[in-house]
C-alpha cells in the first residue's frame, strides 16, 4: 500500500517507497544469490500553455480536473502535482517494479492529462525550458516563499523557467531514514548497494546532460549551452538559480563510505543556513515551513525521503526520450546491483570500465569539470562526450529490459537529442527568436507530444498483466524466515552467472 506523505518540495503529495515492502537479500537453497526487485518512479514537469503557445497560470484548475478525472478512471490522483509556479505541473508514476510497468503508468497518466488539457483549451509543453521571455508567478506557499527569500526573488524565477524529468531508484531498506539521513547502522551489503547506486548516478551526470538537452532557447535567445542545466545549476558564469550555492544545487562528489554522504548532508545544511543568514531570513521560518535535509538539497543527484536515490539531471523532454533515458539508467543500475559492483573512481579513467567486481569511473574532478563542460557546450558532438556515452550504453546494454525503448537515442557515431532536432528545423536561426518563431516552436512541441503519447499508448498503454506486481501472485522464496519477492517468471540467478553473461555481452559490444 502506498503511504500518503507530504511532498517536501511543495504542497503536492507523493507515494513513499515503503522500506518494509522490499526484502533483504539472501542465499537460495542452490547456493545462488537472489535479490529483491528494486522499484523506480518517474516525475516529469510540464509548462501549461494555451493553444497559441502562450504560457498560462492555470495549474490549480488543471490539477482539480485531473484529480477528478483520475478518480473516475481508476488512476491515482496523487500522480498529478503542483509545482513552484502557477504555470507548471508535475505528472508522476507510482513506484513500479519494471520499465514496462513504469511506461504503462506514465503513458496512462499523460493520456489523462492531455485529455483534461484539451477540455480546458490548454496544452502541455514538455521541454526543459520555455523558449520566449517568461516571468512565472510563484505559488503562494510558505516553503517557496522562504526559498525565494534566501535565493533572491529574481533568481528564484529560474525554478519556474526550467522543467526537469527525475528518476527515483529504490535503495535497500534501512539505508536512508525518512528525514533523509544516510543510515550508518544499515547492513554492510545494503550500504554497498547505496554507495554503488549513488556513485553510478554521479558518474552518469554528464552523459545524461548531453543526451537529454532539449530547448536551446532561454528567455528568447540561445548561446550554445545546455540551457536548463546552466541556468538551473548556475554554472559557467551564468547567474542561475544556484549560482554560488554548489553544495545545495550542484553535483556532489562520490562517496567511498556512508560517512561521506553524512558529511555532504552536513555541509549542505551549513551552506543553506549561511545563505539564510546572508539574506536576513530567520531560521525559524525555515523550520516552520517544514524545513529538513531534503529542503536544503536540489542537487542533480540526491538521496530522497522516499528511500531512493533521485536523479534530477535530465531536461524535461518528449516522452519517447524520457523513457529511453530512464530505461538506460535503470539497466546500468541493475547491473551495478545484481553484479554487486563497487563503483570506483580512478585517475586516467575516461569512461565506464567494468573489471571483475569493480566498475572504474573517471575522477569527480573530470566528471564535474572537463566532461560536464563539454556536455553543456558541444554536447554529443564532442568526442570525449560521445566516447563516454558509448561506454554508458555498452555497460547498460546487457540489462536493458526493453531494448526498443532506447532506439530514439541513436547509436554510436550518431547519437541524437531533442535540441539538435529543434535547431535543424529553425531556418536562418540567429542568437534570438522572434515571438512568432517561439510560439511556433511551442505549438509544434505540444503537437509532437500529443502524437507520441497516443502512439506509445497503442503500444504500451495499460499496465501489462505480466508487469503488474501483485504480491499475492509473486513467487516468494523464504530464506531464514525472510521473504524475497522475485518478479513473476524470473528465475533467481547467481551473481557469477550474471557477471559472466554481462562480460560476454561486453566483449561482443566492444
Question: Can you describe what each PLM-predicted range is?
Answer:
Residues 125-135, 142-165, 169, 174-264:
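Metal-dependent DNA replication initiation modules
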Residues 121, 209, 337-341:
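Secondary-structure transition/hinge residues
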Amino acid at each position: 500500500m502506498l503511504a500518503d506523505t507530504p511532498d517536501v518540495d511543495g504542497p503536492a503529495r507523493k507515494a513513499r517507497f515503503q522500506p518494509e515492502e522490499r526484502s533483504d537479500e539472501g542465499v537460495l537453497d542452490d547456493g545462488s544469490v537472489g535479490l529483491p526487485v528494486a522499484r523506480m518512479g518517474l516525475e516529469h514537469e510540464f509548462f501549461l500553455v494555451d493553444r497559441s503557445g502562450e504560457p498560462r497560470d492555470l495549474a490549480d484548475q488543471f490539477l482539480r480536473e485531473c484529480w477528478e478525472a483520475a478518480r473516475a478512471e481508476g488512476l491515482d490522483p496523487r500522480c498529478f502535482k503542483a509545482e513552484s509556479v502557477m504555470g507548471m505541473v508535475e505528472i508522476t508514476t507510482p513506484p513500479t517494479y519494471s520499465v514496462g510497468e513504469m511506461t504503462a503508468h506514465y503513458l496512462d497518466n499523460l493520456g489523462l492529462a492531455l485529455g483534461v488539457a484539451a477540455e480546458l483549451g490548454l496544452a502541455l509543453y514538455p521541454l526543459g525550458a520555455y523558449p520566449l521571455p517568461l516571468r512565472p508567478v510563484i505559488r503562494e506557499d510558505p516553503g517557496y516563499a522562504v526559498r525565494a527569500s534566501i535565493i533572491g526573488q529574481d533568481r528564484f524565477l529560474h525554478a519556474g523557467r526550467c522543467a526537469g524529468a527525475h528518476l527515483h531508484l529504490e535503495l535497500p531498506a534501512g539505508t536512508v531514514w525518512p528525514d533523509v539521513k544516510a543510515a550508518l547502522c544499515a547492513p554492510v551489503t545494503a550500504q554497498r548497494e547505496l554507495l554503488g547506486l549513488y556513485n553510478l548516478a554521479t558518474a552518469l551526470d554528464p552523459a545524461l546532460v548531453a543526451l537529454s538537452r532539449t530547448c536551446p532557447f532561454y528567455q528568447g535567445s540561445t548561446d550554445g549551452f545546455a540551457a536548463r542545466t546552466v541556468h538551473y545549476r548556475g554554472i559557467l558564469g551564468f547567474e542561475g538559480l544556484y549560482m554560488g550555492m554548489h553544495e545545495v544545487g550542484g553535483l556532489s562528489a562520490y562517496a567511498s563510505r556512508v560517512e561521506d554522504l553524512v558529511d555532504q548532508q552536513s555541509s549542505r545544511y551549513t551552506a543553506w543556513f549561511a545563505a539564510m543568514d546572508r539574506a536576513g531570513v530567520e531560521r525559524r521560518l525555515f523550520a516552520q515551513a517544514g524545513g529538513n535535509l531534503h529542503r536544503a538539497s536540489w542537487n542533480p543527484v540526491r538521496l530522497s525521503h522516499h528511500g531512493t536515490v533521485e536523479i534530477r539531471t535530465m531536461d524535461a523532454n518528449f516522452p519517447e526520450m524520457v523513457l529511453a533515458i530512464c530505461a538506460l539508467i535503470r539497466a546500468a543500475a541493475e547491473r551495478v546491483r545484481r553484479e554487486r559492483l563497487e563503483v570506483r573512481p580512478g585517475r586516467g579513467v575516461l569512461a565506464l570500465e567494468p573489471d571483475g567486481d569493480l566498475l572504474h569511473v573517471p575522477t569527480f574532478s573530470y566528471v564535474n569539470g572537463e566532461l560536464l563542460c563539454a556536455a553543456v557546450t558541444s554536447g554529443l558532438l564532442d568526442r570525449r562526450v560521445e566516447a563516454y556515452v558509448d561506454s554508458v550504453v555498452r555497460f547498460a546494454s546487457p540489462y536493458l529490459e526493453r531494448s526498443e525503448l532506447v532506439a530514439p537515442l541513436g547509436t554510436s557515431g550518431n547519437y541524437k537529442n531533442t535540441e539538435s532536432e529543434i535547431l535543424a528545423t529553425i531556418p536562418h536561426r540567429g542568437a534570438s527568436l522572434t515571438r512568432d518563431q517561439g510560439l511556433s516552436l511551442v505549438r509544434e512541441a505540444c503537437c509532437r507530444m500529443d502524437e507520441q503519447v497516443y502512439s506509445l499508448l497503442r503500444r504500451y498503454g495499460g499496465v501489462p498483466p505480466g508487469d503488474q506486481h501483485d504480491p499475492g501472485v509473486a513467487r516468494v522464496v523464504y530464506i531464514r524466515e525472510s521473504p524475497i519477492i522475485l518478479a513473476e517468471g524470473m528465475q533467481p540467478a547467481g551473481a557469477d552467472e550474471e557477471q559472466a553473461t554481462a562480460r560476454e555481452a561486453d566483449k561482443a559490444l566492444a
